[in-house]
Amino acid sequence: MAITRRSFLKGVATTSAASVIGPSLLASASANAAESTGTWKVTGSHWGAFRAHIYAGKVQEIKPLELDKNPTEMLNGIKGIIYSPSRVRYPMVRLDWLKKHKYSADTRGNNRFIRVTWDEALDLFYRELERVQKEYGPWALHAGQTGWNQTGSFNNCTAHMQRAVGMHGNFITKVGDYSTGAGQTIMPYVLGSTEVYAQGTSWSEILENSDNIILWANDPVKNLQVGWNCETHESFKYLAELKEKVAKGEINVLSVDPVKNKTQRYLENDHLYINPMTDVAFMLAVAHVLYNENLYDKKFIDTYCLGFEEFIQYVQGKTKDKVEKTPEWAAAICGVKADKIREFARMLVSGRTQILMGWCIQRQEHGEQPYWAAAVVAAMVGQIGLPGGGISYGHHYSSIGVPSTGFAGPGGFPRNLDQGMKPKWDNNDFNGYSRTIPVARWIDCLLEPGKEINYNGGKVKLPDFKMMVISGCNPWHHHQDRNRMKKAFRKLQTVVTIEFAWTATCRFSDIVLPACTQWERNDIDVYGSYSNKGLIAMHRLVDPLFQSKPDFQIMSELTQRFGRREEYTRGMSEMEWIESLYNDCKKANEGKFEMPEFNEFWEKSVLDFGEGKPWVRHADFRKDPELNPLGTPSGFIEITSRKIGRYGYEHCQEHPMWFEKSERSHGGPGSDKYPFWLQSCHPDKRLHSQMCESEEFRATYAVQGREPVYINPIDAKAKGIKDGDLVRVFNGRGQLLAGAVLTDSYPRGVIRIEEGAWYGPLNEKEGAICTYGDPNTLTQDIGSSELAQATSANTCIVDFEKFTGKVPPVTSFGGPIEVA
């Protein structure tokens, strides 16, 4: 039975059935199918656990696992991933690279490839590793890309690639990620941890104790459909309870967001529209009200915080900018009336208030500031560490807020060399370059090699790398400014990509090796990313299609070419590794959780450890800040960071501040030419770019075969655009085609194209239109500030018009142009 939007939302409104006391063994992995033909197998994914009906060597049907009471409709897209026309079928080498080698950069991206054998492809891969280490050194090889990969503890493709390549020689790697780069860098200075990936106060504590919940740029109903590990969707039972409490008037929920998002439509809660990228101005005005009306918790500030006086002097306009951050000042920037700002500030202290921040808000220029300013507002309210109060930065992610059982999940395949082992090319001379770079600044390395940039209190010298190895991630999705990327990629001599789907990253590579999907190999994974509800056996559903191979096999064959296969595999097969990881996990949980022998677990497929105990974030710190200090330099909440102040940065100073953006809609810089803000948030029907290749599922939301662009009806009417029209969206960085969806969920001056839409350029030339609708064709590639150097994708303004020319075919999903 297919999962529909209606059945998904109905599931959200049901309460999850209670689990049995203690661990239980659920459901055979290979029970006979009800149809008496084929078998049913249990496996998992980022979208949840499911049973697959296998007949004649093919997946026929997918059903959610019974433990998942709120399965996502995206499970309907999994078959389309396995059998996608976009699969990488054979080892492929770019034709001009094979003919002209490193002198073929001008045609990179033309998608013309020639099929080769596995031996030929791996020989070329190894030859290039040898050449680069011999001619240049470790600074010339980048193997540190980032991505969600696929689920599974053993088959982490990045770990397999980095262990294998690392056995050959050292390489450039990265720090940070695209999702939370600014947030995870600033928050250790403020609250002592990254916060974004930390377990948060349990939903049950919030529902029981909160009077007010602020969803700030936060859309959990959309984002909790996916999880880092195999997702359980347990959060949705709490969201259903929250919906009931909102309807009864027991909890006041307010969304602060430039758009009316999916969560607000589900909860039917109040909404405060705010101009894009102006939240910090709003927050500073809230702080002004709390201070000047004497509403803030002075005792909390004095007991648990440092640097309040310096910050409040800035808010009062008594520092160098001489601007008092009044509600009237903020209203002119953020579009919220001054009286509404005062009303909001008073509401925060009217009862127990839980602030739940999203991630989209920190993916902008000066993205460190809204997270820091929000923490200061929460500190002034004075409820950090109380049940149902304080601030969280992750309740929309991977079931954060679902109580953890305390089960210690299995380890993974090691990405580093074993102790005492050295690479074949044991060279640690990086020629004065930095060996680790901020993840979002790698294109800068290609365009400005040798440039020294500030980063998090230190200096980074951008390496002049010549070769990239990319495994299981799609930088031609998650990085910004496609035309800048085209220019940069022409500087590379060799790009090797290991992938199961022919993404734009493959299009711009030289050697492409076909990995299989996670459903064509065996694995094991935690069931419930933060709840650690259980353990799931991820059974191979079908054999690897075409000539694809598991990453473990690919890298085993690569390491064999330089005599390191035995060290790489430790002499174990795939199933021996999985059993070893299980047994280590069993030992780690001895005396806490009962786990059967491996074969019994593998047959039964799922261990369920029930529910964990509720927890309150920062409660220990509040109880005794001396005994339980935060991880900040002082151990306290740092409203002012003297450490950051000593860095002397222009765009991230000693306390939260308002910085104007380089471009901004609604009267901001550049809005006279490009008046619309482009929001490129996480998609509703994908995991980033994963599942965009699933044809039938993509057809459920695409418009004329293109990615939707969501437009306010009044803005659309002014440009003669109707629902379903093709639209050209453009700015000085690029242009794309998308299909118009008119909705009043978006205010005037705001459009949305969700990230993860596959880049499909009309050709390899700079400036070519994207035929499908990748928003990163338009976004700018600049660092958030000198502190985090993180992505600033949401600092992006555009214009749009009805497309009237000859409609080009979509080029995103057809695979390579194979040249005989």
Swiss-Prot record:
Localization annotation: Periplasm
GO biological process, one term: anaerobic respiration
Domain of life according to the entry: Bacteria
Cofactors demanded by this protein: Mo-bis(molybdopterin guanine dinucleotide)
UniProt-listed Enzyme Commission number(s): 1.7.2.3
EC main group: oxidoreductase
UniProt xrefs under Pfam families: Molybdopterin, Molybdopterin_N, Molydop_binding
Transmembrane residue ranges: none
Subcellular location, principal: periplasm
Keywords linked to the UniProt accession: Metal-binding, Molybdenum, Oxidoreductase, Periplasm, Signal
InterPro entries per UniProt: Asp_de-COase-like_dom_sf (IPR009010), CT_DMSOR/BSOR/TMAOR (IPR041954), Molybdopterin_N (IPR041460), MoPterin_dinucl-bd_dom (IPR006657), Mopterin_OxRdtase (IPR006656), Mopterin_OxRdtase_prok_CS (IPR006655), Prok_Mopterin_Oxidored (IPR050612), TAT_signal (IPR006311)
UniProt PTM: Predicted to be exported by the Tat system. The position of the signal peptide cleavage has not been experimentally proven.
Molecular function GO terms recorded: electron transfer activity; molybdenum ion binding; molybdopterin cofactor binding; trimethylamine-N-oxide reductase (cytochrome c) activity
Cofactor note: Binds 1 molybdenum-bis(molybdopterin guanine dinucleotide) (Mo-bis-MGD) cofactor per subunit.
Gene3D superfamilies cross-referenced by the UniProt entry: 2.40.40.20, 3.40.50.740, Dimethylsulfoxide Reductase, domain 2, Dimethylsulfoxide Reductase, domain 3
Residues that, per the record, bind Mo-bis(molybdopterin guanine dinucleotide): 179
Known function: Reduces trimethylamine-N-oxide (TMAO) into trimethylamine; an anaerobic reaction coupled to energy-yielding reactions.
Family: Belongs to the prokaryotic molybdopterin-containing oxidoreductase family.
The protein, known as: Trimethylamine-N-oxide reductase
Species of the source: Vibrio parahaemolyticus serotype O3:K6 (strain RIMD 2210633)
